[in-house]
């Protein structure tokens, strides 16, 4: 959520920056109307309440003096009715303004490339050499099916499309990656491990920006109004909702493994085979709470931490600086890390690393004090995948495949695989 005071005094500037996102700003123009009416109603209501108090005191004086107070009593009733009407209108205006504020995306950072679509994203850097195969490489779903380590067909029978059973060495590879990533981020990168709930309430989804805009993309438990988490970012960020931290606690860095659940409502027909786009998948998420002046340095560190996973796995990748039209709703600046997938002949996203500045913290009311009695300020929040496990499995299977269909296990994972060097 944007700062309403900043928006009020910089309306045209904010509007111009949001236009770079390519968002529909039809409702945005209502801000000035609603904000002005809200402030008018507040003034009118306070004036009438003040008058009501004065009249009430006058009535008390008249009654003590045994004088007729009927006219003033009638006047107070009229004032009370006006206050009630104004309060009702104020409540409606505030609800409309709140809905509008929750629907306004974050302001892009000045360093985000201006553009409309993914074609306008900018390559920040690349790492590793794309392997040239002496044979026609297979897609990971064929490799895994032939090896008996992934079963999409039975998962489709048990649940439906976009689900999978991991079996044997496939299940162990998934588990190895989870342990490897968590060990790396906690032991070397300084994150504290968290194992979060997989269901959250509506306030949590609103705090991180999934609601109200993206409710159709979420799986909801209607009987409880809980949501299955689309990412560990949601529960982990909301750990500190409605809290005031002190500056000595910052930065806070969490690494959280979780399963993630997404309806993929807008992805019909895309990536229908394999692990790239599943309704349920595992991920290690990195979440940070930092002082505002440190957040862009922390974004670079966060991105480097996610990159380090791919470097140790020796998987070629590139880092994209996302343009204003491809930032997503909540980010002020975002990097996507894309790993090379041979069967696609291109790079595919495996991590998004974002700085939300105070956007989420304002929605979730997460603040800190620089001094014991200082005025609370909103923290800046960041998060990034460190990494998506299923897509990492896909990248390993395809990049490490051999002509006979076996898979070389990356050296860094072998201690987690019981010393095995090959999946066959």
Swiss-Prot record:
SUPFAM superfamilies xref list: Class II aaRS and biotin synthetases, tRNA-binding arm
Residues annotated as binding L-serine: 231-233, 285, 385
InterPro entries: aa-tRNA-synt_IIb (IPR002314), aa-tRNA-synth_II (IPR006195), aa-tRNA-synth_II/BPL/LPL (IPR045864), Ser-tRNA-ligase_type_1 (IPR002317), Ser-tRNA-synth_1_N (IPR015866), SerRS_1_N_sf (IPR042103), SerRS_core (IPR033729), tRNA-bd_arm (IPR010978)
Catalytic activity: tRNA(Ser) + L-serine + ATP = L-seryl-tRNA(Ser) + AMP + diphosphate + H(+); tRNA(Sec) + L-serine + ATP = L-seryl-tRNA(Sec) + AMP + diphosphate + H(+)
Pfam families: Seryl_tRNA_N, tRNA-synt_2b
Ranges in coiled-coil conformation: none
A GO cellular component annotation in the UniProt record: cytoplasm
Ranges that cross the membrane: none
Tagged with keyword Cytoplasm: yes
Pathway the protein contributes to: Aminoacyl-tRNA biosynthesis; selenocysteinyl-tRNA(Sec) biosynthesis; L-seryl-tRNA(Sec) from L-serine and tRNA(Sec): step 1/1
Key words of the record: Aminoacyl-tRNA synthetase, ATP-binding, Cytoplasm, Ligase, Nucleotide-binding, Protein biosynthesis
Classification via Gene3D superfamilies: Bira Bifunctional Protein, Domain 2 (3.30.930.10), Serine-tRNA synthetase, tRNA binding domain (1.10.287.40)
Binding-site list for ATP: 262-264, 349-352
Annotated compartments: Cytoplasm
GO molecular function: ATP binding; catalytic activity, acting on a protein; serine-tRNA ligase activity; transferase activity
One biological process term in Gene Ontology: seryl-tRNA aminoacylation
EC top class named in words: ligase
EC annotation from Swiss-Prot or TrEMBL: 6.1.1.11
Function text: Catalyzes the attachment of serine to tRNA(Ser). Is also able to aminoacylate tRNA(Sec) with serine, to form the misacylated tRNA L-seryl-tRNA(Sec), which will be further converted into selenocysteinyl-tRNA(Sec).
Subunit relationships: Homodimer. The tRNA molecule binds across the dimer.
Protein family: Belongs to the class-II aminoacyl-tRNA synthetase family. Type-1 seryl-tRNA synthetase subfamily.
Domain notes: Consists of two distinct domains, a catalytic core and a N-terminal extension that is involved in tRNA binding.
Name of this chain's protein: Serine--tRNA ligase
Organism for this UniProt entry: Bacillus cereus (strain AH187)
Record gene name: serS
């Amino acid at each position: 959520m944007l700062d309403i005071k900043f928006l009020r005094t910089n309306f045209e500037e904010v509007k111009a920056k949001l236009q770079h996102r390519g968002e529909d700003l039809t409702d945005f123009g209502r801000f000035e109307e609603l904000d002005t009416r809200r402030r008018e109603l507040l003034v009118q209501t306070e004036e009438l309440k003040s008058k009501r108090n004065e009249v009430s005191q006058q009535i008390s004086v008249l009654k003590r003096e045994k004088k007729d107070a009927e006219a003033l009593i009638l006047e107070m009733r009229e004032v009370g009715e006006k206050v009630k009407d104004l309060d009702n209108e104020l409540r409606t205006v505030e609800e409309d303004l709140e809905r509008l504020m929750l629907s306004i995306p974050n302001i892009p950072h000045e360093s985000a490339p201006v553009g409309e679509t993914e074609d306008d994203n900018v390559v920040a850097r690349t790492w590793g050499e794309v392997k040239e195969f002496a044979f026609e490489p297979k897609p990971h779903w064929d490799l895994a099916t032939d090896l008996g380590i992934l079963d999409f067909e039975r998962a489709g029978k048990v649940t439906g499309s976009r689900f999978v059973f991991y079996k044997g060495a496939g299940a162990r590879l998934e588990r190895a990656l989870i342990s490897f990533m968590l060990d790396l981020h906690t032991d070397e990168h300084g994150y504290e491990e968290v194992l979060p709930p997989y269901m959250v309430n509506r306030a949590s989804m609103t705090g991180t920006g999934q609601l109200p805009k993206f409710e159709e993309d979420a799986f909801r438990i209607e009987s409880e109004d809980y949501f299955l988490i689309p990412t560990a970012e949601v529960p982990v960020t909301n750990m500190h909702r409605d809290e005031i931290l002190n500056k000595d606690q910052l930065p806070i860095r969490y690494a959280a493994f979780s399963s993630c659940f997404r309806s993929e409502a807008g992805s019909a027909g895309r990536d229908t085979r394999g692990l790239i786009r599943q309704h349920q998948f595992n991920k290690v998420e990195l979440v940070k709470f930092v002082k505002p002046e440190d957040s862009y340095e922390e974004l670079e560190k966060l991105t480097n931490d996610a990159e380090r996973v791919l470097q140790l796995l020796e998987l070629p990748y590139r880092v994209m600086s996302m343009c204003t039209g491809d930032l997503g709703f909540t980010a002020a600046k975002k990097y996507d890390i894309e790993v090379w997938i041979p069967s696609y002949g291109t790079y595919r996203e495996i991590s998004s690393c974002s700085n939300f500045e105070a956007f989420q913290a304002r929605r979730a009311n997460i603040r800190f004090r620089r001094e014991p009695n200082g005025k609370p300020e909103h923290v800046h929040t960041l998060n990034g995948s460190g990494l998506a496990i299923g897509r990492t499995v896909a990248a390993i299977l395809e990049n490490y495949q051999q002509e006979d269909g076996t898979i070389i296990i990356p050296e860094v994972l072998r201690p987690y695989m019981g010393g095995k060097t090959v999946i066959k």
